[in-house]
Amino acid sequence: MSSVKRKQPPATLLQRRVRPRYEPEPESDVEEMSDAPSEEGAGFDSEDEEMSEAEMRSGSDEENSELGSDPEDGEDESEDDTPQPTHQLSFGALAKAQAALGDKLNKRKRRSSSAASEASSSRDNSNNDNKFSLEKNHKKPLEKPSRTSKHAPVELSSKRQVSRRRDFLLDPTSTKPQHRDPRFFAPSTMSATSKIDEIKARKAYAFLDEYREKEMQELRVAIKKSKNAEEKEKLQKALLSMESKKKAQERKDKAQKVLDEHKKKEKELVRQGKNPFYLKRSEQKKRVVVETFKGMKKGQVDRAIERRRKKVAGKEKKLLPWARRTVEDR
């Protein structure tokens, strides 16, 4: 054993464990050790002394860096401001750096989460304000129409909400539905029920024909008195429209009269025990035509037949295909 005495480190350094840095030994040292085995003891002792001194120095440096009491460290730090490479740093310094970075990241996350929570709370408050304003502006539901007694008619308001669509450029007749009064206009669909309703309405409001006749007479007088050409033309068109409607209604009344007479006869035959006979559409038209020609003179009948022939011929021509052009036509 060598007689060299080792220096004892302080008690604080003995309690602290520091892992030595691994450094590969040069090949020359290994060869010397193999050549001189007699000097192993002395070499080991000197190396142990150097390691102990390095440990003491590193421990004292770490303590000074932790406590911050040694003034010489500030001078060393000011002198060595250049960053050291990571492979030369100790594990303690790396751990401290990682802890510091983790604290910074946690602070950033907390700030972002707090900002997001504030934004969501502000959005919720704005939504609540909007809901409150909508509920405030929302009108109360309208009261249901009431009546004084169960026999009295229901009182309804004549007010109607104006449409927000600006359809002044459109044709009102094509877009807006036209309201129809069943007393004056026949229903568009001629089903069995609508036909019955039309007959009932015609019988119930037959007195309107007298009013229409008076209106036509007033129009004739106004046409004679008017001197404005445009106004006179409008009055003539209105008179012509009313006259055509009157003639069409008379034709319908005659056709309905023929059917009513046939039904009356069939009812009497059914009472006698015979089977009912229903007229076809074609037979109904024939009987209506015969009934209209009965009250006409010969010249009137000829003119009516000619008009009917031209009408049928025009319909047939519309159904025919267009003639192909030939070389002569070119």
Curated annotation (Swiss-Prot):
It comes from Podospora anserina (strain S / ATCC MYA-4624 / DSM 980 / FGSC 10383). Transmembrane segments: none annotated. Keywords: Coiled coil, Nucleus, Ribonucleoprotein, Ribosome biogenesis, rRNA processing. Belongs to the RRP36 family. It is found in: Nucleus, Nucleolus. Residues 113-131 have a biased composition (Low complexity). One of its GO terms (cellular component) is nucleolus. Residues 1-189, 242-264 are annotated as: Disordered. This is rRNA biogenesis protein RRP36. It comes from the Eukaryota. Pfam families: RRP36. GO terms for biological process: maturation of SSU-rRNA from tricistronic rRNA transcript (SSU-rRNA, 5.8S rRNA, LSU-rRNA). Associates with 90S and pre-40S pre-ribosomal particles. Residues 132-146, 243-264 have a biased composition (Basic and acidic residues). Residues 25-38, 61-82 have a biased composition (Acidic residues). Residues 212-272 form a coiled coil. Component of the 90S pre-ribosome involved in the maturation of rRNAs. Required for early cleavages of the pre-RNAs in the 40S ribosomal subunit maturation pathway.
